[in-house]
Design a protein with these regions (language model features):
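Short coil-to-helix segment of the ABC ATPase nucleotide-binding domain corresponding to the Q-loop/switch region
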Residues: 103-110
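Conserved ABC ATPase signature
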Residues: 143-147, 151-153
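Conserved ABC ATPase "signature" region
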Residues: 72-73, 121-138
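Conserved ABC transporter NBD signature motif
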Residues: 65-73
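ABC-type ATPase nucleotide-binding domains, specifically the catalytic core motifs of the NBD
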Residues: 17-19, 110-121, 132-134
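Conserved catalytic motifs of ABC-family nucleotide-binding domains
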Residues: 164
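Catalytic Walker B motif of ABC-type/P-loop ATPase nucleotide-binding domains
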Residues: 168-171
Length: 224
């Protein structure tokens, strides 16, 4: 694709100091991600997949190297700037859903924008994306514990999309779902990608990875 990469890593390393010795989670990783790509990240347990995703999503900072988001270096930003960047540009989907148990489904979805958007508009936007996820209106007032796993993941995806992010990061998005429900979730992610979202997902499942157009493999913190 033409234009500036949405993500660029330059010799990025992440090292965790532990009493027993340093753990190198990522070792001099360089890569680029173009806008509109759909990428699967695969590798053995402990290979650095989640660390890579956390760095892509501004949830962590590298020990060494540089990370750029749409040409802007983010690897040395302040915590406040990283928080704003996550809020405005990035959506996250997690294996465990990470919904707030005491909030209703629609309140969970509008949560990322409630402080930056007036109440009426945040509710309208939340309902819009929930309907796009094929969630029945009757479920909007249900709390997460009253929803099935597939419904919870649809709510989680709606929450990730409510701020209309450029980049959607997914960590094992079908890991807690049965095959049929997982397929439905992957069709939703594929549709978001067709509508121009850049999607990067960590998965151990080759059938899930097959939805992506590129696969990045990590072994022992390095690109294989």
């Amino acid at each position: 694709m033409n234009g500036e990469p949405i993500l660029r890593f330059e010799d990025v390393s992440k090292i965790y100091p532990l009493p027993a010795g340093d753990v190198v989670a990522l070792d001099r990783v360089s890569l680029t991600v173009d806008p509109g790509e759909f990428i699967a990240v695969m590798g053995p347990s402990g290979s650095g997949k989640s660390t890579l995703l956390n760095l892509m999503g501004c949830l962590d900072v590298p020990t060494a190297g540089k990370i750029y988001l749409s040409g802007r270096e983010i690897s040395r930003m302040s915590d406040d700037d990283l928080t704003r960047l996550r809020r405005d540009r990035i959506g996250f989907v997690f294996q465990q859903f990470n919904l707030i148990p005491l909030l209703s489904a629609v309140e969970n979805v509008e949560f990322p924008i409630i402080l930056t958007t007036d109440r009426e508009e945040s509710r309208r936007r939340a309902i819009e994306v929930m309907r796009a996820m094929h969630l029945d209106d009757a479920l909007f007032t249900h709390r997460p514990g009253e929803l099935s796993g597939g419904e919870q993941q649809r709510v989680a995806i709606a929450r990730a999309l409510v701020n209309d992010p450029d980049l959607l990061l997914c960590d094992e998005p079908t890991g807690n779902l049965d095959t049929k429900t997982g397929t439905a979730i992957m069709e939703i992610l594929a549709e978001e990608n067709r509508e121009s979202k850049t999607v990067i997902m960590v998965t151990h499942d080759p059938n899930v990875a097959a939805y992506a157009r590129r696969t990045i493999r990590i072994v022992d913190g390095r690109l294989a």
